[in-house]
Amino acid sequence: LKSGATCIAYETIEVNKRLPLLEPMSEIAGRMSVLVGGYFLPKHFGGSGVLLGGVPGVLPGKVVVLGGGSSGINAARMAQGLGADVTILEVDVERMRFLDITLHTAHTLYSNRAHILDMLPEVDLLIGAVLVPGSRAPKLIDREMMRVMKRGSVFVDIAIDQGGCAETSRPTTHHDPI
């Protein structure tokens, strides 16, 4: 500040309600969330043993994505590419229409506590991809809701850099993500 320099946090630059400089990182985070989450689903990692894409005679895994922004749509695309059954919960109806047209086989559902609770008992991989520009992420999942998830399910919270979207979320590292 003493130097008189003008400093700009690039990730917060907003153009037409979008964060264009944050988008590339969000795209990567969304895609990686499915790969990393799927990696921890085998039983030897404490997961449920579900293969996200399934195989003939076995249903695919269920992936639920909270938030349909850049991270969320990329998580959904990656999960669809693996053959998973994908549902995206979103609060913006126009965005849901876009997701429906763009992702074809993914289901969209209005995001609220009741719908999240309905999804949790069956989810194999839950991805938190909510972003409120300039604010902390809303806490969509509390401790009691986490207990509803089946044993061995995996939760990846992309929103952790904004405080996480679950009450139990805490920062981890790529080296030690659990």
What is the role of each PLM region?
Residues L1-G61:
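Glycine/serine-rich phosphate-binding loop and adjoining beta1-alpha1 elements at the start
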